[in-house]
Amino acid sequence: MIMKIVSIAPRLLLLTVLALLAGCSTLNVVSDGADPQLMLRGNDPVAYHTLGKAVAGDPQIKAQHEGVTYRFTNAAHRDLFLATPQRYVPAYGGFCASGAPYALKANIGANTFKIVDGRLYLFGSARSRRHWEMDQQQNIALGDRYWEQETKDRSFRPQNWYRYTFRVAHYKTDAELEAEWQRRYGKPDAAPAKAPAG
């Protein structure tokens, strides 16, 4: 009986790994009815730029770009997107910008964002955005480098497993980032005396 269990163990491990990898994506997408690869959780990518806020797109007004679906509030936004999609596609495949400098692909809610030099960055929370803004330019440079050299074409689960196991040298925990925020700006929810540029 023990021999059977031992011989089954590698197969069970393989099945577990395959189950974990199933559904992995190189982009942060969700499934919503007829749109199994929905970007930005259905928010209009153009509205972040033109309205300065996250706005849910109409499921009837949509476009495909690089294998994913984007929804729009109106046809004019869809046309703007289709004319220059690179202007509106979110940085880092729609994953959280605060994970990018650590070569991590963290999920986002799509409502917390910042536009820097015309580029859309998304965050999982206001706190992660605040931490990222402390060293915004460095975080963009690191995030861009890791995205192109390592994370862009890797599925998020194996990538995150790898980088949580083998962290980049400059990795900081949320607690360390919050302590740095407090050291620089005071209490946790205080706005900085001088807002980071961007």
Task: Describe these PLM feature segments.
Residues 2-13:
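Bacterial N-terminal signal peptides that target proteins for export
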Residues 7-9, 18, 169:
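N-terminal non-cleavable signal-anchor helices
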Residues 12-23:
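Bacterial N-terminal signal peptides
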Residues 24-66, 87-198:
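Intrinsically disordered, low-complexity terminal tails and linkers in eukaryotic proteins, enriched
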Residues 67-74:
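Short, well-structured hydrophobic secondary-structure segments
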Residues 74-77, 125:
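Beta-edge loop/turn motif
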